[in-house]
């Protein structure tokens, strides 16, 4: 079960428009079903790597519903939207997983 920091709850409300209670459920889904760093390649992989190095406490970065979730173990630190240029790549990765 993912935990959500106060900062992450504030950011999910601000950036995604969802409440704290729903943010907990959303963080769980992102942790379980989100695209992992190891699933990516190319420029998306480099982008996720740069986020990993910028966030000192981060050790788990996931992409879920066109948003980037930064975790430390199972604690959500922050969330922000995925840049538009990477969204096609993530949809291809999702389709490849289902097959």
Predicted regions and their residues:
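Ribonuclease/tRNase effector modules and their secretory precursors
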Residues: 1-99
């Amino acid at each position: 079960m993912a935990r959500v920091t106060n900062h992450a709850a504030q950011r999910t409300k601000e950036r995604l428009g969802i409440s704290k209670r729903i943010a907990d459920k959303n963080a769980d889904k992102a942790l379980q079903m989100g695209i992992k760093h190891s699933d990516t390649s190319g420029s998306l992989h480099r982008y996720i790597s740069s986020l990993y190095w910028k966030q000192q406490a981060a050790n788990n970065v996931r992409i879920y519903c066109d948003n980037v979730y930064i975790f430390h173990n199972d604690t959500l630190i922050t969330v922000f939207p995925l840049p538009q240029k990477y969204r096609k790549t993530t949809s291809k990765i999702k389709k490849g997983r289902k097959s």
